[in-house]
């Protein structure tokens, strides 16, 4: 039986490959594929409307090697940044119950 972290890693990898290569390199997300992934898998991140300028800025920030696509490493950096932002948010929240030692 897979542990929760193993399952999370599987979801990260399988989600990338679900969208990558529909229109080209099967190991990269082009702009259309990335937008579809974010719209379907992270809808609260994009909000209800997609601001094209904001999306293009995100794409440019993720595309560290400037090939106009997002590879798996760039995708993981993006998810890591989101995870760190979530962690910082929850660090500021008071604990409801004291932590067990």
UniProtKB/Swiss-Prot annotation:
The modification N-acetylalanine is found at residue 2. The keyword DNA-binding does not apply. GO terms for molecular function: actin binding; calcium ion binding; calcium-dependent protein binding; chemoattractant activity; identical protein binding; protein-containing complex binding; RAGE receptor binding; transition metal ion binding. One of its GO terms (cellular component) is nucleus. SMART domains: EFh, S_100. Ca(2+) 1 binds at residues 28, 33. It is found in: Secreted; Nucleus; Cytoplasm. Its main location: secreted. Ca(2+) 2 binds at residues 63, 65, 67, 69, 74. One of its GO terms (biological process) is positive regulation of canonical NF-kappaB signal transduction. Residues 12-47, 50-85 form the EF-hand domain. Keywords: Acetylation, Calcium, Cytoplasm, Metal-binding, Nucleus, Repeat, Secreted. Homodimer. Interacts with PPFIBP1 in a calcium-dependent mode. Interacts with PGLYRP1; this complex acts as a chemoattractant that promotes lymphocyte movement. Interacts with MYH9; this interaction increases cell motility. Interacts with Annexin 2/ANXA2. Interacts with TP53; this interaction promotes TP53 degradation. Interacts with CCR5 and CXCR3. Interacts with FCGR3A; this interaction inhibits PKC-dependent phosphorylation of FCGR3A. This is Protein S100-A4. The lineage of its organism: Eukaryota, Metazoa, Chordata, Craniata, Vertebrata.
């Amino acid at each position: 039986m897979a542990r929760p972290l193993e399952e999370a890693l599987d979801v990260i990898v399988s989600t990338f490959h679900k969208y990558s290569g529909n229109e080209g390199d099967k190991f990269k997300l082009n702009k259309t594929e990335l937008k579809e992934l974010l719209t379907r898998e992270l809808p609260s991140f994009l909000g209800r409307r997609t601001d094209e300028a904001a999306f293009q800025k995100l794409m440019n920030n993720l595309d560290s090697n400037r090939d106009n696509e997002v590879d798996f490493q760039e995708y993981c950096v993006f998810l890591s940044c989101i995870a760190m932002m979530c962690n910082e948010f929850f660090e500021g929240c008071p604990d409801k119950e004291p932590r067990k030692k």
